[in-house]
Amino acid sequence: MSKGKPPSRPATQIVEGGRRSEWTHLGGGKGGIVNPPVWRASTILYDDVAALRAGVRTNEDGKLFYGRRGTPTQWSLADALTEMEPEAAGTMLYPSGVAATAVALLSVLNPGDELLMVDSTYDPTRGICEGLLKRFGIATRYY
């Protein structure tokens, strides 16, 4: 959604969300495509090792970084979802529910904290609690 435009109705936001001209317009009056294309990428090539390390260090939106987190497909979807929530600061997308669970837990827990977790939790979530969180000094108590 371009800045300065009045807010669109939700149905319009769903259809138009996430469009950036750098992904959809050819420029020079040549037109373009309606929606950003799907970028399929598992590996991103860099000119040299220094550029790779800089990419890993900064991991900026808008810069190709890694196939599951760093292509216009992900950025376009994140932009569209953010536009649907006017008060949102942004949107983070994760390649799996396990990754999303780990980040959600790590975003609110600190070393020395104790997490109360239902005993019937999804097994990979238990693995996060028993492995990753434990290594960070976060205890888990099951109930």
Task: Pin down the residues of each PLM region.
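N-terminal glycine-rich, Lys/His-bearing helix-loop that initiates the first secondary-structure elements
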Residues: 1-61
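Conserved N-terminal alpha-helix of the aminotransferase class I/II PLP-enzyme fold
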Residues: 48-99, 124-131
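Glycine- and other small-residue-rich loops at beta-strand/loop junctions that grip anionic moieties
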Residues: 66, 93, 118-119, 140-143
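Glycine-rich helix-loop-beta junction characteristic of Rossmann-like nucleotide cofactor-binding loops
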Residues: 83-85, 106-109
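PLP-dependent aminotransferase-class I/II
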Residues: 127-143
